[in-house]
From Swiss-Prot:
It comes from Simian immunodeficiency virus (isolate F236/smH4) (SIV-sm). Vif-defective viruses show catastrophic failure in reverse transcription due to APOBEC-induced mutations that initiate a DNA base repair pathway and compromise the structural integrity of the ssDNA. In the absence of Vif, the virion is morphologically abnormal. Induction: Expressed late during infection in a Rev-dependent manner. Residues 170-190 have a biased composition (Basic residues). Residues 166-201 are annotated as: Disordered. This is Virion infectivity factor. The modification Phosphoserine is found at residue 147.
Length: 214
């Protein structure tokens, strides 16, 4: 008697491209800029028995929780083989775990990683002084109800980016540079180049980097 196939069903996000772009950006932010120094990158040959997993990236968060992004390959649908890759994004606490959307994962990441406006920037903005910090992960605020302080600082930084101060223009360009840097570094890895990627790139968000929801 032929044994029936057992299926393991988990929610995943299909991605249109391979995961080199994601791996490249994670390694750059972990080893070069140190923005993700606490993150743990596990390549496919260290995953172990889970042969369908091509990588795991674990982000320790506050209060003994962590976020995990698993990349899948060789997935089998009902017919044929899945030609594209997929990722699963899961949040874990001590006694509970749940799958989360890319947007909410960005919010969780920003609670621990990537600097935002400092507490004293609101007072500086009111006094008309030069702001010395900026949010390096603006995508994480996309689905949140922004505070009045965050809105005010965003407006101030936007106005100054249109003026004479080139620093704020650079902050805005950095939001786009993150994804571009990941693409370029991925190509360099394929070509065997040892040239280091550009520094100062902001994190563009999980959905943007992985290409999901495109």
């Amino acid at each position: 008697m032929e044994e029936e196939k057992n299926w393991i069903v988990v929610p995943t996000w299909r991605i249109p491209e391979r995961l080199e772009r994601w791996h490249s950006l994670i390694k750059h932010l972990k080893y070069n800029t140190k923005d993700l120094q606490m993150a743990c990158y596990v390549p496919h040959h260290k995953v172990g028995w889970a042969w369908w997993t091509c990588s795991r990236v674990i982000f320790p968060l506050r209060d003994e929780t962590h976020l995990e992004v698993q990349g899948y390959w060789n997935l089998a649908p009902e017919k044929g083989w899945l030609s594209t890759y997929a990722v699963r994004i899961t949040w874990y606490s001590r006694n509970f775990w749940t799958d989360v959307t890319p947007d909410y994962a960005d919010t969780l990441l920003h609670s621990t990683y990537f600097p935002c406006f400092s507490e004293g920037e609101v007072r500086k903005a009111i006094r008309g002084e030069k702001l010395l910090s900026c949010c390096k992960f603006p995508k994480a605020h996309k689905n949140q109800v922004p505070s009045l302080q965050y809105l005010a600082l965003t407006v101030v930084s936007h106005v100054r980016s249109q003026g004479e101060d080139p620093t704020w223009k650079q902050w805005r360009r950095n939001n786009r540079k993150g994804l571009r840097m990941a693409k370029q570094n991925s190509r360099r890895n394929k070509q065997g180049s040892s040239k280091s990627p550009a520094e100062g790139a902001n994190f563009p968000g999980l959905a943007k980097v992985l290409g999901i929801l495109a």
